Amino acid sequence: MLHASFSNAQLTPTFYDNSCPNVSNIVRDIIINELRSDPSIAASILRLHFHDCFVNGCDASILLDNTTSFRTEKDAFGNANSARGFPVVDRIKAAVERACPRTVSCADVLTIAAQQSVNLAGGPSWRVPLGRRDSRQAFLDLANANLPAPSFTLPELKAAFANVGLNRPSDLVALSGGHTFGKNQCRFIMDRLYNFSNTGLPDPTLNTTYLQTLRQQCPRNGNQSVLVDFDLRTPTVFDNKYYVNLKEQKGLIQSDQELFSSPNATDTIPLVRSYADGTQTFFNAFVEAMNRMGNITPLTGTQGEIRLNCRVVNSNSLLHDIVEVVDFVSSM
């Protein structure tokens, strides 16, 4: 079990002010360009950061590909065939490396990218604490154990968040608001629509009109990879409509609606109501929760490394470069 330690003192928003002062602008410009062709990429980048931080802290371990010594977290149940945005992170990292070689970690690149994605989609602007370093391995088993599932009940959600040190109700409710934009696959809601808890009936907490809409998008024998908007009101905008939806029983996945409809929701219902009533209240809570999540067991100082290629640890990256040079020289 991972118990988080928060290290605010080691991370600071000014970390790259001298060594790479334009890093945030570099990241932002690339995301602006990506959004032109893929409006849902902002939500995908935020999700990558979330899934990174929940597994051994925010160390960019989710970005590593398979090696002979470890399996990638990309194969974990919560990531396989759903985590996306890796090529965008590659492009951001390459641009940052051109401007500031061997300076900005992949973990910080992903953290900045998540913040910029939220802001560009209409969400708050804030300076994220920086100074993380990158892990030298991935943690598939930990990803399978730690990542919350769409079918989680509220007690299971609370346990998953507390397990990584996010033990405030506001952590859970505010970070769940990341589902105010983005999409989800039909396969994650089929039980809610047709056979909730093996009853042969839909989830009773699902608004009946919304149920019919979702059944049209996700028919019983249809393609379960079809994508459905998390937020039926403003699907690509980062706002507080997610919470308005929960009040109307229109949360897309079970773990969303649990925040308002679970018998155990006495401490989360008031927060859902508060965020639904005030965008700024939600934004303030979201920024605080994002910074707390961003401070889960960071590698700092001389721990870990600054990866040159976010997909591979440096020894492999350098070996790859050396092999290319040797091949080139031998062909001369």
Curated annotation (Swiss-Prot):
Q: Which domain of life is it from?
A: Eukaryota
Q: Which residues carry this modification: Pyrrolidone carboxylic acid?
A: 10
Do the record's keywords include Isomerase? no
Which E.C. number(s) belong to this protein? 1.11.1.7
Q: Which cofactor does it need?
A: Ca(2+); heme b
Q: Which residues are glycosylated?
A: 22, 66, 195, 207, 223, 264
Tell me, in one coarse class, where this protein mainly resides.
secreted
Extract one GO cellular component term from the record: extracellular region
Residues annotated as site: Transition state stabilizer: 47
Residue positions of the active site: 51
* Localisation: Secreted; Vacuole
Q: Keywords on this record?
A: Calcium, Disulfide bond, Glycoprotein, Heme, Hydrogen peroxide, Iron, Metal-binding, Oxidoreductase, Peroxidase, Pyrrolidone carboxylic acid, Secreted, Signal, Vacuole
The record ties this protein, via CDD domains, to:
secretory_peroxidase (cd00693)
GO MF, one term, reads: metal ion binding
Query: At which positions is Ca(2+) 2 bound?
Result: 180, 231, 234, 239
Reaction equations catalysed? 2 a phenolic donor + H2O2 = 2 a phenolic radical donor + 2 H2O
One Gene Ontology term of the biological-process aspect is:
hydrogen peroxide catabolic process
Family, per the entry?
Belongs to the peroxidase family. Classical plant (class III) peroxidase subfamily.
Query: What name is this protein filed under?
Result: Peroxidase C1C
Species annotation: Armoracia rusticana (Horseradish)
